[in-house]
Structures are given as C-alpha cells and as structure tokens.
Amino acid sequence: MQQENMTRGHAWQFLEAGRRLERAINGLSLIAGSARRCRTDDAILTPLLEVTDSTMTYRRLHFARPSLLPVADLLLLSEENPRSTSAQFHRLARVFAELPAGTSGNPGHQRELLDGLRSELASLNLDALRSFPDAASHRIATLCSDLATGCESISAALTEHFFSHAHRRSD
C-alpha cells in the first residue's frame, strides 16, 4: 500500500533505501549459499531463480538448464534484471542523491560505501572464471558475502547519520 499511497518525500526515500538494502542483502545471502552448494549440486540454481523472481528472464536469455555463471550474471551484474544486485545498487545511488543533508557525520559516507561496493561488484569477471568452476563458486560466494557485509555497513551509516541523536566524542 505504501508504494501507491505515500508521497515521495524524505520518508519515502528512507523506505526505498531500506527496501533496496534488504533486497540486496537477502539476494546476496541466497546467491552465496547457492554458489557454495553448487560445487556439488547445481540443481539448487532452479529454486534460486524462482525465489529471486528471475526464472522467466533466465529462460528468455538462456535456452539451457541453469548453471552458475549465467545465473550469477543475471542475479549480480545484469542492469536489465530489476532483481539483480547491480540494479539494487543503481536504485540506491538514485535514492542517496535525493536524501537530505542530515544532522551529523559525513553526509557522503554512505555514498562512498556504495561506490566501493559497486566497484567491487564490477570487478567480477565471469569470463575469466569459466574454465575454473570450483574457483568460480568460491569467488562468487566470497564476493556475495563481502557485498552483503558492505550493505549492512551502509545501513549502519544511514542510521548513524540520520537517526542517531548522540554525538561521538573525538578523543
């Protein structure tokens, strides 16, 4: 209901930021677990696509059974998939541009954190991993875990900057 009935002010921006962070964290956790499991059983990728609401998109792009690298490309890097991590980060950047200056701390800190995560995600070279399936699953799982931790740091930075009324003392 709030998506249709809420005015698009600052409260909306915070709600949208929370939604994007939550979707990114949950998706990254699912992808990380699936990548680890995929070393022994790639059947886990079909339910992963279902849970991330990306089955039809995958089928439209790939006329084959799901495999790790194309699934990772769709769920992590694809700008066209609105459920991908890259799309969540893109929408977060737009939200951050609309947020007020705040009352304390570094107003650009969450943007800097997000820029770092976007760079880290962009560094994933799936083509280089095609010949090394074990390394691919490890690299994807590790990257997803790191990105999820980074998203939690962004959430903490937003909370501290906009919702913390206590000031840190500099010693």
Q: What kind of feature is each model-predicted range?
A:
Residues 1-171:
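Alpha-helical transmembrane segments and their helix-helix packing motifs
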